[in-house]
A protein has these predicted regions:
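N-terminal pre-domain/capping segments
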Residues: 1-66, 72, 76-94
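Conserved functional loop/turn residues at catalytic and ligand-binding sites
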Residues: 25, 100, 192
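Active-site acidic/histidine proton-transfer and metal-coordination neighborhood
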Residues: 74-172
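Active-site beta-loop-alpha junctions enriched in small/polar residues
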Residues: 7-11, 34-36, 68-71, 109-111, ...
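Residue-level detector of conserved catalytic or cofactor/ligand-binding positions
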Residues: 184-192
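Short hydrophobic beta-strand that contains or immediately precedes a catalytic carboxylate
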Residues: 65, 173-175
Length: 193
């Protein structure tokens, strides 16, 4: 089965997202777990989640994709920023268990002059601190466009992170085609005549 959807606003809750996606002709969606620029997440309403799960069953939804806030930087040079990343991860992964078995996508981070190897190590450290055996959510490392000191713009960097993660079965990759296009990893030529 083909699963298709779009990024949608979570401001009105899970059931509203599900209804909007059905209206759009989709059967999955992505959403931010909280304001994409950071901040606290809204409380999850169990009745809202139950309504969403009915919609998802009725319309044969695929897995949904929660997106971490853009401000999450797992390899920041400043410890307080890495603490924010770890705490946000922990909170979001706990909240994701309200809708078990889905995806949590995040931008790996920017090493900000520390070097790619240090960035990779710090990202793996955060992942090792937050991933648990009990969680049902798969965490996705998103491919990046290579702007500034972003980590994850090359597949080798993502692989290096994954190689350092202990609970590898809780981890995957989100191939952001816009990002890899921007980095020129995708080459499309005109068909020959």
């Amino acid at each position: 089965m083909l699963y298709i959807g779009n990024h949608t606003s979570s401001s009105k809750g899970y059931a509203a997202m599900g209804r909007q996606i059905v209206k759009n002709g989709g059967n999955t969606f992505a959403f931010f777990t909280r304001n994409p620029r950071g901040g606290n997440a809204k409380a999850i309403d169990p009745a809202d989640v139950a309504k969403f799960q009915e919609i998802a069953r009725e319309h044969e939804f695929g897995k949904i994709v929660a997106h971490a806030p853009y401000t999450l930087n797992a390899c920041a040079a400043k410890e307080n920023l890495r603490d924010f990343a770890r705490n946000t991860f922990l909170d979001d992964l706990k909240r994701m268990e309200a809708t078990p078995g889905n995806y949590y996508n995040f931008h790996p981070g920017s090493h900000v002059g520390q070097g790619i190897e240090v960035g990779i190590q710090k990202i793996a450290e955060v992942l090792n601190a937050v991933l648990t055996e009990e969680q049902t959510t798969t965490v996705l490392l998103e491919t990046m466009a290579g702007k500034g000191s972003e980590v994850g713009s090359h597949f080798q960097e993502l692989r290096a992170i994954m190689d350092l993660v202990e609970k590898r079965d809780k981890l995957g990759i989100c191939l952001d085609t816009c990002h890899v296009w921007d980095l020129s990893l995708i080459h499309i030529s005109e068909p020959t005549r």
